[in-house]
From Swiss-Prot:
Lineage: Bacteria, Pseudomonadati, Campylobacterota, Epsilonproteobacteria, Campylobacterales
Originating organism: Helicobacter hepaticus (strain ATCC 51449 / 3B1)
The keyword Cytoplasm belongs to this UniProt entry's keyword annotation: yes
Gene Ontology CC: cytoplasm
Keywords: Cytoplasm, Isomerase, Porphyrin biosynthesis, Pyridoxal phosphate
Cited PANTHER family: GLUTAMATE-1-SEMIALDEHYDE 2,1-AMINOMUTASE (PTHR43713), GLUTAMATE-1-SEMIALDEHYDE 2,1-AMINOMUTASE 1, CHLOROPLASTIC-RELATED (PTHR43713:SF3)
Family per record: Belongs to the class-III pyridoxal-phosphate-dependent aminotransferase family. HemL subfamily.
EC number of the protein: 5.4.3.8
Gene Ontology MF terms in the entry: glutamate-1-semialdehyde 2,1-aminomutase activity; pyridoxal phosphate binding; transaminase activity
Name of the protein described by the UniProt record: Glutamate-1-semialdehyde 2,1-aminomutase
Obligatory cofactor(s): pyridoxal 5'-phosphate
Length: 435
């Protein structure tokens, strides 16, 4: 595969952009090789600057549930742009979008739009601390909630890729208010509550997507809700990745556990910079200008991003079999990958919910970040490189999640499985030839 233009682009980018990328995982640091510089996408496929075609399971890290260059979204954007790019004033579309999110998800009474998942979780934490008049928070090792200082502690993919638990530049005076519990371990959460009597909230990805794909156990989520009530702490469920990905009602719908506050992003923006946080009205009404908790943004509720979000949600609403179709494809993919690996006695753990999936080169089921870290990342890197050379674009880290889009079909999935089986065969042959 010729990737000369990507090599040249990457070298040029590194001269003016730190690491050559604007988000670290894109640099292929954990899998090796040269990141592909993408020129365009259509449906299930992306094309690099050398015009190589790839089946794309990254889908912009989750937002593109209908695939690349969706015509309905493109049309909505084209119309919106003609009316102006940004006003810094309220628009009817903002209210319409928020109503759609609330009605479809059933997860909040009121909601505010922001520009990124990091903004959403950061704002939700500030609000929870103000509401409870407490300072400490509990998060889970391996869960990623953006790069705000309070949450950049044991943060999964963004840090796990580089083997560091946090980041330089994050003051201890801030992180001392963050307690870290073990995912799927309710007793570790209780221990955090016993350690601090000043816990404002617990924040969690019910479907963890940044330690690889690791779903929470249903009983764990139910016990977590009860524990938050017992200790008078708010429960924040981070649906930035899983919202409208795992199903119409996201992870909250799968677990039947109500959050006090919830965050959204990715799908609700349809590929544009858009996120949201919401929850009970009595909590949300503490936000300025109604209450005293300050939160603001020049481009919050940007009409172009809102138009893309509306076009996405209205398509979801009009397609009642969407999530069933996506999950059928996801299950077909992970079943095929596991069987392909087994045929060469390569251990592979797989799982999916809705259109989210993941796999680990691991001997045992992965239930938390400790389990995930025991995975064979060298094997993942070899697999990733070889699949990329065969035109399959998986997430470039063992500690990330994959995504199915509606533009995919059984033929595409079967093609990927066939290529994976060939790759497992190549890897096995290479290993045996060295013995």
């Amino acid at each position: 595969m010729d990737i000369l233009q990507s090599i040249n682009d990457f070298n040029e980018a590194k001269q003016v952009i730190p690491g050559g990328v604007n988000s670290p995982v894109r640099a292929f640091g954990s899998v090796g090789g040269t990141p592909r510089f993408i020129a365009k996408g259509k449906g299930a496929y992306i094309y690099d600057e050398d015009d190589n075609e790839y089946i794309d399971f990254v889908q912009s890290w989750g937002p593109l549930i209908f695939g690349h260059a969706n015509e309905v979204i493109e049309s909505a954007l084209s119309l919106a742009i003609k009316d102006g790019l940004s006003f810094g004033a309220p628009t009817e579309k903002e209210t319409t979008l928020v109503k759609q999110i609330i009605a479809l998800s059933g997860s909040a009474e009121k909601m505010r739009l922001v520009n990124s998942g990091t903004e959403a979780t950061m704002s939700a934490l500030r609000l929870a601390r103000a509401y409870s008049n407490k300072d400490d928070i509990i998060k889970f090792e391996g869960c990623y909630h953006g790069h705000s200082d309070s949450l950049l502690v044991s943060a999964g993919s963004g840090c796990a890729t580089f083997g560091t638990p946090s980041s330089p530049g994050v003051p201890n005076d801030i992180t001392k208010h963050t307690l870290v519990a073990r995912y799927n371990d309710i007793e570790s959460v209780r221990a955090c509550f016993e350690q601090s009597k000043n816990v404002a909230c617990v924040i969690i990805e019910a479907l963890a997507g940044n330690m690889g794909f690791v779903p929470a156990d249903k009983k764990f989520m139910q016990d977590l809700r009860a524990l938050c009530d017992e200790y008078n702490a708010l429960l924040i469920i981070d649906e930035v990745m899983s919202g409208f990905r795992a199903g119409l009602k996201g992870a909250i719908g799968l677990y039947d556990v109500q959050a006090d506050l919830v965050t959204y992003g990715k799908v609700i923006g349809g590929g544009m910079p858009l996120a949201a946080f919401g929850g009970r009205a009595d909590i949300m009404d503490m936000l300025s200008p109604v209450g005293g908790v300050y939160q603001a943004g020049t481009l919050s509720g940007n009409p172009i991003a809102v138009s893309a979000g509306l076009a996405t949600l209205l398509q979801i609403k009009a397609n009642p079999t969407l999530y069933e179709h996506l999950e059928v494809l996801a299950k077909r993919l992970i079943k095929g990958l596991k069987e392909a690996a087994q045929s060469y006695e390569i251990p592979l753990q797989v799982d999916c919910r809705g259109s989210m999936f993941g796999f680990f080169f691991n001997q045992k089921e992965v239930k938390n970040f400790d389990d995930a870290k025991c995975s064979d990342t060298a094997m993942f890197a070899r697999f990733h490189q070889k699949m990329l050379d065969k035109g399959v674009y998986f997430a470039c880290s063992q500690f990330e999640t994959g995504f199915i889009c509606s533009a995919m079909n059984e033929m595409i999935i079967d093609e990927v499985i066939m290529k994976a089986k060939a790759v497992f065969g190549e890897i096995t042959h290479e290993i045996e030839s060295r013995i």
